[in-house]
Every structure is written in C-alpha cells, then in structure tokens.
Amino acid sequence: MLNSLDLEGRPQDTRVVVAMSGGVDSSATAALLKAQGYDVVGITLQLYDHGEAIHRKGACCAGQDIHDARAVAERIGIPHYVLDYESRFRESVIDSFADSYASGETPVPCIECNRSVKFRDLLATARELGASALATGHYVSSRRLDDGSRALVCAADRDRDQSYFLFATTREQLQFLRFPLGDMTKPQTRELARQFGLSVADKHDSQDICFVPTGRYTDVVERLKPNAMEPGDIVDVDGRVLGQHPGIVHFTVGQRRGLGIASRSPLYVLRLDAAQRQVVVGPREALLMDRIVLRDINWIGDGSLDDVIGDGLELFVRVRSTRAPQPAWLRAANGGYEVELVVGEEGVSPGQACVFYDAAEGQARVLGGGFIKSAAPRRFEGGREQIEAPALAAARG
C-alpha cells in the first residue's frame, strides 16, 4: 500500500529529507510531513558567502536563513544539519553565471542550482542518509504514471508555479523527489505555517538571486569576469555606431531604458555580441522571434525524444518564467533541436530556458526543455535582419 508520498511503507518507517532554506515554503513542508508521521530530516545548504562573492569581507548573508531553518527544526522536533556546499555551488552556479553574462547571455542561475546542486548533490546525500525521498518547498507537483514512473506537472497555483525552473530534472531524480506544496496556494502555505506555530509564517519571500542580495549582479560578474566590463559600441542593425556602452554585462535583450543614446523613435536591445563587444539595437518589432535554436535538451515526456519527434512535435513552450505557455513546434534540425513559435515572442534571450508543456493551462505536464542558444527574428520592415522561420514562411505562402 502506498503512503501519501506514493511510497511503499508506513510514514513512520519512511525517512524523508527536506531541503530547508529557512523560508516559509520549505519550513511548512517539513512541518507537514512531520505531522503526517514521516521520519523527517532537515538539511540546509550553506551555498555562498556574500562578502566573498563581491570581493569584500563580511559574514555570510544567509546566516539568518540558517538560523530560521534551525529554529523551525527545533520547533517541530526533527534533526537538522547544515552542509557546506560553497565550493560546489561556486563551481556549478556562480562561475557559470558569470561566464554566461560575459558571453552575452542572460542566465537563470536557479535552474543550474536545482539541476546540479540540489537535485544531484543533495539528492545523493539524502540517499546516503537512508532516505526514501527528498522533499522540497517548490510550487510544482508530480504524479505517478501507469508504468510506475513519475511526471512533473505544474502547480495548482499558476501564479506561484515554479516548473520553469525545474525542467532540467531527470526521470531518475523525479522518482526520488516529492513536492508536497504542489496543490496549495501561498496563502494556504502561510496559514499552515501559522497552525504549526512556525516563526517564519510571515517571512517575506526572497526577490533577488540568492548570491546577489543587493540586486547588483554586475558586482559578481566584474569580480569574476572583468573583461565583461570592457566598453564597446552601441550599433543599429545596419552596423552604424550610435554610441558607446560601459560593458555588455549591463544590458539584456529587450531592454529599452538606460541605453544612453538619443533617438527619434524608441530603440531596444536586440542582441549582444560579446566577441565584438557590441550592443545591437533596433525597433521593437525586431524583437519578435519565430525560431529558437536550443542546446542541452532534457526530455522527460513519454518515450525518447528522437522516437516521438517525427517531422515535428506540437506542444507549448515558455521562454520566460513569467510568461504563459505558447503554442509551438519542436523539430530536429542540423544535428540539434529548434522550436518554431506559432506566434512570435518578444525578447527571447540566449541563456534563458525554453520549457516544453503538453497544455497551455491547468496542471500541465512538463515535457522537458532546453537552453536558448540563439533566435531568429520575425520579418520586419527596415534593417537587414529580415529572417523568418522556414515552416512559417511556407505556411504564409
């Protein structure tokens, strides 16, 4: 008989490691599982020292979070451990974050953290502790399929859904992971924390990248990749120099404000050329992208991707975490994979993720995704970049 976590055995005979960040979500997760009778072990990861990250002395800014997690563990009566993962977090997340910005991309460090630190390293630690599952406070869910495997699905609360950040989760990891908050809303989670008497019930959510609490990610990049701060030219789509910039790291695709150049019509950042140290700008219509080339694909749908893709696979994709899934086609091309959007998306930036879903609404299943390598813009009047996805061009006649 399966317990509430879809695991064999009674809760009291089932050890579950909970990744405790010190926030209300993971704290409520730990308290809920403890109340259900599971053998819960809380683990908090010390991932970085903020002072070191920006090259100045100072205490770890995550100290309060560790204190809060420890206080919650004491309150609900579970063992709690703090593990030093700083070196692996720097290698897997911070260094790649700086490399990505220096190459003209806009990275999503939370995806890499989930993929390489939490769901690889911490999951391995949980197994070593004899756990049957690793539970987190993510707003996402999973369900058992007929063959015994598990599917990753969107949270019931779409405003809180974090599936975009978990697309790189593997099938093997999904078998071991559990997400108890997947069917709850944030207000329900806070109320649950109050019922358990947790001190973090009203703790504010973090709004910044965890290792950049000041919001100035350029401080981290400048420390690790000073070449990214070298000045260069701001040019239009025809290559005409319109002005200079202090470093491509200060810009992202779709940006309009802060360009430092005068123009009779609004200009937007279209792309960043790290090799030439150029910021390419143009009209808003040039931001519309139809075709996206992907790298590092992770497929967690049914079967193997090569077997199911055929001449093209119809699905829905999100190119930013804050955007709704849009209809698209996934195709094999040039030894890799491309996405053709039915309707163009603005500001598709290399380094961001393109996540696949089987539906646009409800608790859709996550089919996987990949990182955006490049994108081709929709045809627009003016400029040289009049490129159109071949399939869409044929459809339009």
From Swiss-Prot:
MF (Gene Ontology): ATP binding; tRNA binding; tRNA-uridine 2-sulfurtransferase activity
Active site: C113 (nucleophile), C210 (cysteine persulfide intermediate)
Pfam family, one: tRNA_Me_trans_C
E.C. designation(s): 2.8.1.13
Swiss-Prot/TrEMBL site (Interaction with tRNA) positions: H138, Q352
Annotated S-S bridges: C113-C210
Region span, Interaction with tRNA: 160-162
Biological processes, Gene Ontology terms: tRNA wobble position uridine thiolation
Catalytic reaction list: S-sulfanyl-L-cysteinyl-[protein] + uridine(34) in tRNA + AH2 + ATP = 2-thiouridine(34) in tRNA + L-cysteinyl-[protein] + A + AMP + diphosphate + H(+)
Any one Gene Ontology cellular component term annotated for this protein: cytoplasm
Top EC class for this record: transferase
Keywords, sorted A to Z: ATP-binding, Cytoplasm, Disulfide bond, Nucleotide-binding, RNA-binding, Transferase, tRNA processing, tRNA-binding
Localisation: Cytoplasm
Binding site for ATP: A19, M20, S21, G22, G23, V24, D25, S26, L45, G137
Role noted for this protein: Catalyzes the 2-thiolation of uridine at the wobble position (U34) of tRNA, leading to the formation of s(2)U34.
Family: Belongs to the MnmA/TRMU family.
Protein name (database record): tRNA-specific 2-thiouridylase MnmA
